[in-house]
From Swiss-Prot:
Cytoplasm found in the keyword field: yes
Gene Ontology BP annotations: aorta development; cardiac septum development; cholesterol catabolic process; coronary vasculature development; endocytic recycling; endosomal transport; intracellular protein transport; kidney development
Annotated PX domain residues: 1-109
Keyword terms, alphabetized: Cytoplasm, Cytoplasmic vesicle, Endosome, Lipid-binding, Membrane, Phosphoprotein, Protein transport, Transport
Entry keyword rRNA processing: no
Organism, as annotated: Homo sapiens
CDD domains in alphabetical order: FERM-like_C_SNX17, FERM_F1_SNX17, PX_SNX17_31
InterPro entries for the chain: PH-like_dom_sf (IPR011993), PX_dom (IPR001683), PX_dom_sf (IPR036871), RA_dom (IPR000159), SNX17-31_FERM_F1 (IPR048763), SNX17-31_FERM_F2 (IPR048767), SNX17/31_FERM (IPR040842), SNX17_FERM-like_dom (IPR037836)
Described function: Critical regulator of endosomal recycling of numerous surface proteins, including integrins, signaling receptor and channels. Binds to NPxY sequences in the cytoplasmic tails of target cargos. Associates with retriever and CCC complexes to prevent lysosomal degradation and promote cell surface recycling of numerous cargos such as integrins ITGB1, ITGB5 and their associated alpha subunits. Also required for maintenance of normal cell surface levels of APP and LRP1. Interacts with membranes containing phosphatidylinositol 3-phosphate (PtdIns(3P)).
Membrane-related topology note: Peripheral membrane protein
Name this polypeptide is given: Sorting nexin-17
Complex and partners: Monomer. Interacts with APP (via cytoplasmic YXNPXY motif). Interacts with KIF1B. Interacts with the C-termini of P-selectin, PTC, LDLR, VLDLR, LRP1 and LRP8. Interacts with KRIT1 (via N-terminus). Interacts with HRAS. Interacts with ITGB1 and ITGB5 (via NPxY motif). Interacts with CCDC22 and CCDC93; the interaction associates SNX17 with the CCC complex. Interacts (via C-terminus) with VPS26C and VPS35L; the interactions are direct and associate SNX17 with the retriever complex.
Region (Disordered): 401-426
Region (FERM-like): 115-432
Amino acid sequence: MHFSIPETESRSGDSGGSAYVAYNIHVNGVLHCRVRYSQLLGLHEQLRKEYGANVLPAFPPKKLFSLTPAEVEQRREQLEKYMQAVRQDPLLGSSETFNSFLRRAQQETQQVPTEEVSLEVLLSNGQKVLVNVLTSDQTEDVLEAVAAKLDLPDDLIGYFSLFLVREKEDGAFSFVRKLQEFELPYVSVTSLRSQEYKIVLRKSYWDSAYDDDVMENRVGLNLLYAQTVSDIERGWILVTKEQHRQLKSLQEKVSKKEFLRLAQTLRHYGYLRFDACVADFPEKDCPVVVSAGNSELSLQLRLPGQQLREGSFRVTRMRCWRVTSSVPLPSGSTSSPGRGRGEVRLELAFEYLMSKDRLQWVTITSPQAIMMSICLQSMVDELMVKKSGGSIRKMLRRRVGGTLRRSDSQQAVKSPPLLESPDATRESMVKLSSKLSAVSLRGIGSPSTDASASDVHGNFAFEGIGDEDL
């Protein structure tokens, strides 16, 4: 997650108290909470008490006198670095002390009282699930409530996550972010003050081998089936006409497991697709559509001749990655109308091992760059867990009154309608040469053999590679 403190505000104290400086903490470019220096100092002291001073990053010291504007700016920069360092630390960033501080601050900033509400959560096929939660319930609480409503077993809850999405005019979802443990889902979605934003339940893992665990349960099977049918209908999963015919036949027979087994062999099964954006590969300002899955980033692009191409970057070939944000300045008459100082430009850049001795930076410019980075990190985490022989199955950390809250009534996952005929305008992708030759490339109907991806966040899954592997 991308933490920043891009601005400060001078605010009046409660009941006519003295004015103070508030620091606006943004997560992924959106205001999360507004806090005072004293609140952050209290957080720092609590973390120091629990973990020791040696573990913590430097915290800006107290000042005896009022700060000048220059000193306020300096403190803002120092607090921003502090919050980023704490969040990036595996111990501190996942601590309940840090996360509960952010949850309380979010609720206080949005001035949302603690009360019971009905929250709408969508399944991948658009089916609505209404759950009764508290406005102060954190992400895991809401996920448990949804699982209870669907009668999903406790040991399968960790295979699914809640995502904040924006519903576009055509009904498609544009993914904003995966909801995290430091936020309150009800507050997160309502604070955006737009009916376009929704919360969606979707599987949270990338390796299709984990499907076997989920498919053994009736509810888990139905959730995977509904998500897969939806992804095919949206064109996220790439199918040929013959594959589509086979899938429809299995769907008519209600052979859900066999349907999923066939879908697992298809290109882009289980991938998350992003909105159209721009990359500097294979050439500058190249329009692309990015998808993440199967330990890779896939870039679909159209080169001269209007042929649709695909390049795949394996996460194990990415040495590191970074997300940067900037505010472009208008350049006289050449700047487009409405494009000004307030528009934030986000970029995901990763250093990719093109050949044994050649690393190259690839940059993707997209409002969803942070979400792409989160996907890369989760793919790396999953690879490392699998490499160490661990399991992604998560045990629930908390219980309410010793047991999970269960809804009085369960809700079944509705079977989606039969697949429609494949879009005749969909084009097959052909392999590229020259500049793209070092990247794994496929046509739509070709077998899913090699996959390629890249990363710059200090990638522990980065592997050495020889020319013969490319």
